[in-house]
Regions:
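Multi-pass membrane proteins that catalyze or facilitate reactions on polyprenyl-/lipid-phosphate substrates
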Residues: 1-296
Length: 296
């Protein structure tokens, strides 16, 4: 990998990680479009450490509060009812599905799942679900304005309404992102909207939930890369990770403002257009579905 490639791929990772359009799909497609070798699942996992560092910085106050409350809940029973302590436990619970499935499906993630036809189909499929969830959320918001904000009857939920059941559902939605094209934020936000959480609450928990999974995945890939016989261009990879982190922070700040007043339809349209284009190019033989594959 050249330094130029690493900068471009870092920009792509940072721009797409937190938007519901799939960073892994865009890294794969960028490499194909430029005629580069597929950077692979390991590169994606390591560069995601950069974007998750952006999450740690952006949500630092929330994270410090949650970690502090969760730690206290381990020692003091009375602290277990604290909302932040509860959030800590729910982030852990929601991280279990992707941890188990990530290890179980590792060979598929690094191989068959990177087929451009599958990526195109998941781009389109999740777009349809996101559109339905967005419309569902809009109707719930309208109902919320008419019935008031009393907990007993409010149709829109916030983070303090999270339950173990909801946390697990979020977790399984996150696990779908093991397939390039799904999008971690897209899947979890879609799940959250269907569970009747507000757009802001769905996005915030989505970003917090990703922290353990992404950092663990990146650390695991770092140990794998360090095995004898493995090869990695450390300089370009580190540069891509730094670029992804800086750009990712700016994207989080923009996205959290965007979703408070706008719908997800621009992302839905983009996903369908991109997925349809990739399918057409593969269908007409312009693109090889395994072009630039890591196993070539």
């Amino acid at each position: 990998m050249t330094w130029f490639e690493s900068i471009i791929l870092g920009l792509v990772q940072g721009l797409t990680e937190f938007l519901p359009i799939s960073s892994s799909a865009h890294l794969r497609l960028t490499a194909v479009a430029a005629g580069w070798r597929d950077p692979g699942a390991a590169f994606t996992a390591v560069t995601q450490i950069g974007t998750e560092t952006a999450v740690l910085v952006y949500f630092r106050k929330d994270i410090v509060r949650i970690v502090t409350a969760w730690t206290r809940s381990l020692v003091h029973k009375e602290a277990r009812g604290n909302i932040d302590a509860k959030m800590g436990w729910l982030v852990i619970i929601g991280s279990v599905p992707i941890g188990v499935l990530g290890l179980t499906l590792k060979d598929y993630i690094e191989g068959p799942f990177r087929d451009l036809r599958l990526i195109a189909c998941t781009l389109i499929g999740l777009a349809v679900l996101l559109a339905l969830a967005d419309r569902f959320a809009a109707r719930n918001a309208e109902r919320a304005e008419s019935v008031g904000r009393h907990r007993a009857d409010r149709p829109v939920k916030e983070l303090d309404d999270l339950t173990v059941r909801d946390g697990l559902i979020y977790g399984f939605c996150q696990a779908l992102a093991l397939i390039p094209g799904v999008s971690r934020s897209g899947a979890t936000i879609t799940g959250g909207l269907f569970l009747r959480y507000s757009r802001a609450a769905a996005a915030r928990y989505s970003f917090l939930l990703a922290i353990p999974a992404v950092l663990a995945s990146g650390a695991y890939e770092l140990t794998e890369i360090g095995e004898p016989g493995s090869h990695v261009d450390w300089g370009p990879t580190i540069l891509a990770t730094l670029v992804a982190g800086v750009v990712g922070y700016a994207v989080i700040a923009w996205f959290m403002r965007f979703i408070t007043t706008r719908s997800f339809m621009p992302f839905v349209i983009y996903r369908i257009a991109l997925g349809s284009t990739v399918l057409a190019l593969v269908w007409f033989g312009v693109l090889d579905p395994f072009a630039g594959g890591v196993h070539e």
